[in-house]
Amino acid sequence: MQFVAFERAKQGTGASRRLRNSGKAPGIVYGGAAEAQLIEIDHNALWHALKKEVFHSSILDMEVNGQTSKVVLRDVQFHPYKQLILHVDFQRVDDKTKVHLKVPLHFEGMEQSQAVKVENCTITPLVHELDVVCMPAQLPEFITVDLSGLTSKSTLGLQGLKLPNGVKAVVRGSNKNPALISIKLPEVAPDASAAPVAAPAAPAKKGKK
């Protein structure tokens, strides 16, 4: 995915505010052998680009002053209640250095699985994106998780996920095999045809003679 940015000279709170008032979003691109570069991007174009999954999880081609460099999105700051981008950060990447990025998981085949189709289970994804490290050329836009073979007794953890060649998952914490989904069995309704159990009769009280 390609986008156009423009070099900016002024920085600071006042300059950024004036930039946003003119319909531009301030940003920075850093990393690699070159120095950090201040940039500005058309706010509306950036706003719509940020709605696309691919803009967050793939190598982007950024054009500045007629020169194109490969970058990844690293951070976006939004206004607390306005539809306004305050600042955006990009990092340069090169073909010889591995990148660390979050990649979305696409769950497929859920409705065709025995767990859902036959056993009426509810399958809930627990993880929606995965930290991965790989070479830029091997970075997938997303990772497909096939759920079509699941039954009510199935489990699916990270170690059971087939990753593309050259892609390695980054796991933090002591749990090296976190669950990716949960499977909930259907609730069993009480049998309405069963005869209610009669309560034992209370003993009769003896009257005075």
Curated annotation (Swiss-Prot):
GO annotations of cellular component type: cytosolic large ribosomal subunit
Keyword Iron-sulfur found: no
Entries under InterPro entries matching the protein: Rbsml_bL25/Gln-tRNA_synth_N, Ribosomal_bL25/Gln-tRNA_synth, Ribosomal_bL25_b-dom, Ribosomal_bL25_C, Ribosomal_bL25_long, Ribosomal_bL25_short, Ribosomal_L25_dom, Ribosomal_uL5_bac-type
Known function: This is one of the proteins that binds to the 5S RNA in the ribosome where it forms part of the central protuberance.
Similarity-based family: Belongs to the bacterial ribosomal protein bL25 family. CTC subfamily.
Subunit structure: Part of the 50S ribosomal subunit; part of the 5S rRNA/L5/L18/L25 subcomplex. Contacts the 5S rRNA. Binds to the 5S rRNA independently of L5 and L18.
NCBIfam families: bL25_bact_ctc, PRK05618.1-5, PRK05943.1
Protein name: Large ribosomal subunit protein bL25
Organism: Delftia acidovorans (strain DSM 14801 / SPH-1)
